[in-house]
Amino acid sequence: MKWKKSLTGLSSYKPGKREEEVMAELGLTKITKLSSNENPLGTSPKVAELQANSSVETEIYPDGWASSLRTVVADFYQLEEEELIFTAGVDELIELLTRVLLDTTKNTVMATPTFVQYRQNALIEGAEVREIPLLVDGAHDLDGMLNAIDDNTTIVWVCNPNNPTGNYIDLADIQAFLDKVPSDVLVVLDEAYIEYVTPQPEKHEKLIRTYKNLIITRTFSKIYGLASARVGYGIADKAIIEQLNIVRPPFNTTSIGQKLAIEAIKDQAFIEACRTSNANGIKQYEAFAKRFEQVKLYPANGNFVLIDLGIEAGTIFSYLEKNGYITRSGAALGFPTAVRITIGKEEENSAVIALLEKLL
């Protein structure tokens, strides 16, 4: 086959191990998955009720415009419906962005380490990837990213909070950054974990009307607990949305996914409960880190913590796995002596911390 040359050297995305796989390998009867940043509290009771009582006409194509969901989300953020695009998770939106803006003559700027799909999709399009190392505390080097922009730059990626470090850039710094980015360079502000930030930042969706080169990406996969429903969305100027819709598949979000997302966003009481539970979980890990001088905990603002124990990452990962907890080794994330752990329920956090204390 005459494959694209840009695929040479690339490999497919490797998701975390499945619970069943680990249990079979290690002979365990119970496993807790804390590797994919899923919501340990599940999803809204209203979503569960809809799932139990909903019937889907599987022979009928879904609404390609996601009309009902579009109206609800637009009302929620006080936006115009044409300022939104819905995709099969943010993953698909990232793919669409690289497809419309990158080719072999262009380059893109991002932090490293950050969410791996920015780089992967850029390389598939044959673009040059300019990676700017994070600062020592895990924060974006925004000045370094600005300096990397040139006439051939078309996209700058900012993951906020950043995955895998958890660092959060406040709104004032984001605006100062946007003020300096050329108006013909798209800034992707990936806010997959924004609902977990405590306290919640000031509403800033309407920044897209000041910065016509900004797209904000969000998802129903994280705090809303709809990871398997695959519903993400982008907020941007209408001109950006129009270009993305040219390459967006016509029926890319499912009927049931759209319905579940509507119920999920309506139940903000559940979201607040998830945010509070998550903040308490972060405090558990912060207290643990304070007890051990050799432990470095990166600033946590998502639903995960990145912990450097000064021990080889594979050793930490295997140790926790053998004791019934799947985490994410930092080795593949650019942190050879760290692990990324999804914040779980209080008792799950306590159990993991107790295991880490024994390891130290």
UniProtKB/Swiss-Prot annotation:
**GO molecular function term, any single one:** histidinol-phosphate transaminase activity
> Pfam families in the record, alphabetically?
Aminotran_1_2 (PF00155)
Recorded catalytic reaction(s): these are: L-histidinol phosphate + 2-oxoglutarate = 3-(imidazol-4-yl)-2-oxopropyl phosphate + L-glutamate
Pathway entry: Amino-acid biosynthesis; L-histidine biosynthesis; L-histidine from 5-phospho-alpha-D-ribose 1-diphosphate: step 7/9
In-chain residues carrying the UniProt-annotated modification N6-(pyridoxal phosphate)lysine: K222
- Judging by the UniProt lineage, the source's domain of life is Bacteria
Gene Ontology terms describing biological process: L-histidine biosynthetic process
Broadest EC class assigned to this enzyme:
transferase
Family, according to the entry, reads as follows:
Belongs to the class-II pyridoxal-phosphate-dependent aminotransferase family. Histidinol-phosphate aminotransferase subfamily.
Subunit and partners? Homodimer.
- What's the protein here called? Histidinol-phosphate aminotransferase
User: By which gene is this protein encoded?
Assistant: hisC
